[in-house]
Curated annotation (Swiss-Prot):
Oligomer. Interacts with human SLC25A6/ANT3 and VDAC1. Interacts with host MAVS. Residues 14-28 have a biased composition (Polar residues). Keywords: Apoptosis, Host cytoplasm, Host membrane, Host mitochondrion, Host mitochondrion inner membrane, Host nucleus, Host-virus interaction, Inhibition of host innate immune response by virus, Inhibition of host MAVS by virus, Inhibition of host RLR pathway by virus, Membrane, Modulation of host cell apoptosis by virus, Viral immunoevasion. The record marks 66 as: Low pathogenicity. Plays an important role in promoting lung pathology in both primary viral infection and secondary bacterial infection. Promotes alteration of mitochondrial morphology, dissipation of mitochondrial membrane potential, and cell death. Alternatively, inhibits the production of interferon in the infected cell at the level of host mitochondrial antiviral signaling MAVS. Its level of expression differs greatly depending on which cell type is infected, in a manner that is independent of the levels of expression of other viral proteins. Monocytic cells are more affected than epithelial cells. GO terms for biological process: symbiont-mediated perturbation of host apoptosis; symbiont-mediated suppression of host cytoplasmic pattern recognition receptor signaling pathway via inhibition of MAVS activity. Its main location: host cell. It comes from the Viruses. InterPro entries: Flu_proapoptotic_PB1-F2 (IPR021045). This is Protein PB1-F2. Signal peptide: none annotated. It holds the Pfam family PB1-F2.
Length: 90
């Protein structure tokens, strides 16, 4: 239950309604927020995460040993160096 409360759609609801249990007692019931609110939260979270993930994927890709990928890696690195050099000179 504790781990379930850490999920963004439960934390971002902002309200708690109640439900009746079998014994007739009122207990708090967490409701999921609407999809627009959830998407906004996901986009905000993704924006914070995207850049580090891209760097990790890039590093993982560069570490692959497949001959075709080694060729592509070399080609991409050469183009990157040329691009970087061009950026510095302009």
């Amino acid at each position: 239950m504790g781990q379930e409360q850490d999920t963004p759609w439960i934390l971002s609801t902002g309200h708690i309604s109640t439900q009746k249990g079998e014994d007739g007692q009122q207990t708090p019931k967490l409701e999921h927020c609407n999809s627009t609110r959830l998407m906004g939260h996901c986009q905000k979270t993704m924006n914070q995460v995207v850049m580090p993930k891209q760097i990790v994927y890039w590093k993982q890709w560069l570490s692959l040993r497949n001959p075709i990928l080694v060729f592509l890696k070399t080609r991409v690195l050469k183009r990157w160096r040329l691009f970087s050099k061009h950026e510095w000179t302009s």
